[in-house]
Swiss-Prot record:
Molecular function in Gene Ontology: acyl binding; acyl carrier activity
Family, per entry: Belongs to the acyl carrier protein (ACP) family.
Protein name: Acyl carrier protein
InterPro entries: ACP (IPR003231), ACP-like_sf (IPR036736), PP-bd_ACP (IPR009081), Ppantetheine_attach_site (IPR006162)
Membrane-spanning parts: none
Recorded name of the encoding gene: acpP
Subcellular location: Cytoplasm
Keywords, comma-separated and alphabetical: Cytoplasm, Fatty acid biosynthesis, Fatty acid metabolism, Lipid biosynthesis, Lipid metabolism, Phosphopantetheine, Phosphoprotein
General function of this protein: Carrier of the growing fatty acid chain in fatty acid biosynthesis.
């Protein structure tokens, strides 16, 4: 599954990582060096960009780039 370009852009902008590192299987914490605050800011940026609310219990399950892409697709946003 292709990663929505906006998702990738937000991750690169929020985490300050090399776009080449943003792959579907990349873990936000282990591979992209995010901490819990980064994750909160990332979720907030996704909510704003895609005009949806991501409940905390869902946000806690978003561990990888693919998790976010799948979640947005399920919500009809990507």
């Amino acid at each position: 599954m292709a990663i929505h370009p906006k998702v990738k852009d937000i991750i690169v902008e929020q985490l300050g990582v090399d776009p080449d590192k943003v792959k579907a299987e990349a873990s936000f914490i282990d591979d992209l060096g995010a901490d819990s605050l980064d994750i909160v800011e990332l979720v907030m940026a996704m909510e704003e960009e895609f005009d949806l609310e991501i409940p905390d219990e869902d946000a806690e399950k978003l561990k990888t780039v693919q998790d976010v892409a799948s979640y947005l697709e399920k919500k009809g946003k990507a």
